[in-house]
Amino acid sequence: MGGRYRWLIIVGAVVALQWVAAPAAAQWIVSPEGQQRQFDRVRLSATYWKGGLEGRIDLGDIEGLPVILDVRDMLGITASEGGYIFEANLGAGRRHRFLFLYGDRKHSGFNVVDIDVTVGGAPIHAEVPIASNIDLRQARFSYNFLFVARPEVEIGLIGGVGWFETIASVDTSLGAATGELRTPYPSFGGNLLINPAGRLRLYAEICGFPEVNVEEFSGWLADFQVRGEFFIIDNLGVLAGYRWYQMDFRLEESDPAFDLKWNGFFFGAQARF
């Protein structure tokens, strides 16, 4: 009797498993693209970013004189030497993802500034060459919750922490000055992924935080990107888009203040698994 019941249980389990699994298996065979894309576990991308830089850098007083540099007019920086951005998107189930970003972008410029001063009642005109360098490094780790997770569209909220380092150096015949700013920051925002057709995808993301004033820290940050992705084969593709990044920070009254805006186009490659 026990053996008979054992076989009945086994047969019943097999029938139940087929009844549950068969529709899912059939759906996977009929539409593998939608099923697989909804559950991408890993997305990796590497992009090259080039564009302009605008803004001001307040280095404070140097030898009793305030030094405020306009990065375009005074420093002669109108375009970047280029930079790179690495991004990783790791899935943990249908609605939970973890995002990691690291980027480095360098700018350099050269300009000749006309200076008119009066010494002993006599006007003196001088031309001062200025060589400058600005380096931005950024890292960010975030949690992404998708409150809409469908094969054709994903919409989510992003929350995390980031870190950036900005170094500005100016070298002239009258002297040199360097300003550095390193700080962690909170990051909040959202993202949107649309799959309009086949291997083509559209992605938009905005992160940052509004104006805050906490103890000796004040500032705000915004990081926005929009891009298109096309997968040549199922797991490898290319992408191109536009990124806009602006920050305004000061840690202490004696530290340099940065009001900078990066923008420009980027292109690169992406893999998904």
List PLM regions with ranges.
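Cleavable N-terminal export/targeting peptides
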Residues: M1-Q38
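Short glycine/proline- and aromatic-enriched beta-strand/turn motifs that initiate or cap beta-hairpins
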Residues: A26-R105, G264-F273
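Hydrophobic, lipid-facing positions within transmembrane beta-strands of outer-membrane proteins
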Residues: V42, G82-F86, R137-F141, I155, ...
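Residues on the lipid-exposed face of transmembrane beta-strands in outer-membrane beta-barrel proteins
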Residues: A46, F86-A92, F141-F145, G159-W163, ...
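Extracellular/periplasm-exposed beta-strand and loop segments of Gram-negative cell-envelope proteins
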Residues: E54-G82, D104-R137, W163-T183, E211-F217, ...
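Repeated loop/turn-to-beta-strand initiation elements of outer-membrane beta-barrel proteins
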Residues: R95-F98, P151-V153, G198-L202, D234-V238
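Detector for outer-membrane/organellar transmembrane beta-barrel domains
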Residues: E154-G156, W163-F164, G175-E211
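Short, loop-centered acidic/histidine patches that primarily coordinate divalent metals
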Residues: C207, F231-I233, G241-Y245
